[in-house]
Amino acid sequence: MKINIMAVGKIKEDYINAGIKEFLKRLKPYTEVNVIEVDDERIPPNASGAQIEKVKEKEGERLLKNVPKNSYVIVLDVKGKPMTSEGLAKSIQNLQLQGYSNITFIIGGALGLSQKVLDTGDYILSFSHMTFTHQMIRLILLEQLYRAFKIIKGEPYHK
């Protein structure tokens, strides 16, 4: 199983980068993880609704052109469906059984995702009703993926 994490923008905070690096290292025995960052679009000050949509569309185009063919696409969005850690593990197992060798998670930028990206997703996932920074959600996603693979393998970590 190959996991792709596609995200808008670069991580600037050292503490988040350290956490991401740690979970990427922990995931190596279980799966290959590729993190693909696309440039974020400059947001005009006092941006209008139309300008906001334009930013999301441009970022969305950059994301979508990097999605591998035949990949199962999970889009992270606050309006998506919640899932437990056990549910994520089961979903990954089920996707493997269905013949998927590639899962792509898409994380939007500061303004979220375009409707086109949301429509492209095979599943829209919400980690919480709360809003997190797009940088923080990358770390949370990696931790949940690590937890999911530990659950799948029946190894201690998940309580």
From Swiss-Prot:
Domain of life: Bacteria
Catalytic activity: pseudouridine(1915) in 23S rRNA + S-adenosyl-L-methionine = N(3)-methylpseudouridine(1915) in 23S rRNA + S-adenosyl-L-homocysteine + H(+)
Residues holding S-adenosyl-L-methionine: L76, G108, F127, S128, H129, M130, T131, F132
EC numbers for this chain: 2.1.1.177
Main location: cytoplasm
A Pfam family that the UniProt record links to this protein: SPOUT_MTase
Keyword field: Cytoplasm, Methyltransferase, rRNA processing, S-adenosyl-L-methionine, Transferase
Compartments, as annotated in UniProt: Cytoplasm
Gene Ontology MF term list: rRNA (pseudouridine-N3-)-methyltransferase activity
This protein's GO CC annotations: cytoplasm
Quaternary state and interactors: Homodimer.
Function noted in UniProt: Specifically methylates the pseudouridine at position 1915 (m3Psi1915) in 23S rRNA.
Family named by the database record: Belongs to the RNA methyltransferase RlmH family.
Name of the protein: Ribosomal RNA large subunit methyltransferase H
Organism, as annotated: Halothermothrix orenii (strain H 168 / OCM 544 / DSM 9562)
